[in-house]
Regions:
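Conserved acetyl-CoA-binding loop-helix of GNAT-fold acetyltransferases
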Residues: 93-112
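Terminal substrate-recognition subdomain of acyl/acetyltransferases
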Residues: 1-81, 116-234
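Short acidic, glycine/Ser/Thr-rich loop/turn "cap" segments at secondary-structure junctions
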Residues: 88-92, 112-120
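Conserved acetyl-CoA binding element of GNAT-fold acetyltransferases
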Residues: 80-95
Length: 234
């Protein structure tokens, strides 16, 4: 996965203007989409699903323009089992709508609904920062998709592995554990990577904590998980 994407803001604004016209053009397939208010922001979100992909169009009614959109795409390089559960978010924002937490809100909608997210082969600097921020609140890691096989690599990878186009980031939606996702998608490598992650965390803890003689106890590895339906978003 490479952090090398750069966008032309002029082209993005033109695309958003074209989409806005289609959303308000009677007879067009984008006309009359369902609407959800985006909190107290004054913005609204028009949404649709097509061919297993989810489209969120964020409209600013006062300005009569689109602030941006997010599409949760299917990835052709994923195995069929994984395609049912993983989507790759793709976002475009108008310049005036950037750095206001809009993309974060839309990604959280998907994650909180139980959708698991996977990155594309390339990201912009802004997208990479967003994924890193979300990783503080959601289970995360890296996966390898080479040969249309999904293999878990752990919560951190070496620089050369990170830079490979078949390495992707992963964010788990609400209610999922790595084990459940591995079982649902056929993802391999979870047990080995989890063992490595535990050893790393244990080593860091031992380096930064003061030993207490006679009070050592095993680390609990179980946690209560509130489960949600693991079917794809509808």
């Amino acid at each position: 996965m490479r952090i090398d994407v750069q966008h032309s803001q002029h082209d993005i604004d033109d695309e958003l203007d074209t989409l806005y016209e289609r959303l308000h053009q009677p007879g067009h397939r984008l006309h009359g989409l369902p609407v959800i208010a985006l909190g107290r922001s004054g913005l609204i979100v028009r949404h649709r699903k097509a061919d297993g992909e989810y489209f969120l169009y964020v409209e600013d009614p006062a300005a009569r323009q689109l602030a941006g959109y997010t599409v949760f795409n299917r990835l052709p390089e994923l195995p069929r089992r994984a395609d049912r559960y993983l989507r790759a978010p793709h976002t475009r924002l108008r310049g005036s709508a950037q750095r206001k937490g809009l993309a974060t809100t839309l990604y959280r909608w998907g994650l909180d609904a139980g959708l698991c997210l996977i990155s594309g082969a390339r990201q912009s600097v802004g997208a990479a920062r967003l994924w890193t921020a979300l990783a503080h609140d959601y289970r995360h890691g890296f996966v390898d998709v080479e040969g249309r096989a999904l293999r878990y690599l752990g919560e951190a990878v070496a620089d050369d592995v990170h830079g490979a186009l078949h390495t992707r980031r992963l964010l788990l939606g609400n209610g999922w554990t790595l084990g459940e996702l591995a079982q649902a998608t056929g993802m391999t490598g979870v047990d080995a990577a989890e063992y490595a992650n535990v050893n790393v965390r244990r080593g860091e803890h031992e380096r930064h904590s003061v030993p207490s003689v006679g009070r050592a106890r095993p680390v609990a590895h179980t946690a209560h998980v509130t489960h949600v339906a693991h079917a794809p978003m509808r």
